[in-house]
């Protein structure tokens, strides 16, 4: 199993709007891609001095083939939508993890 982890620091000024959009729009759209079996959103603790609130959004997929298909067919449009909606109000980085135990 593969976990696609997206860590996002979102500006306090747009936090509530972002949270609503993530829960009601973005995460459901990512899941509708059919490439992931589950997801979860976690708040990063101890990061209060970052100028925003930091979250880890984790999507689980069965294998690398599903992840690579997501990256090729779906991710570019999602990232573009994200950038257009929140522009310079967030910083994100992505990590790919493999469940080994």
Report each predicted region and the residues it spans.
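N-terminal short leaders/motifs
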Residues: 8-13, 51
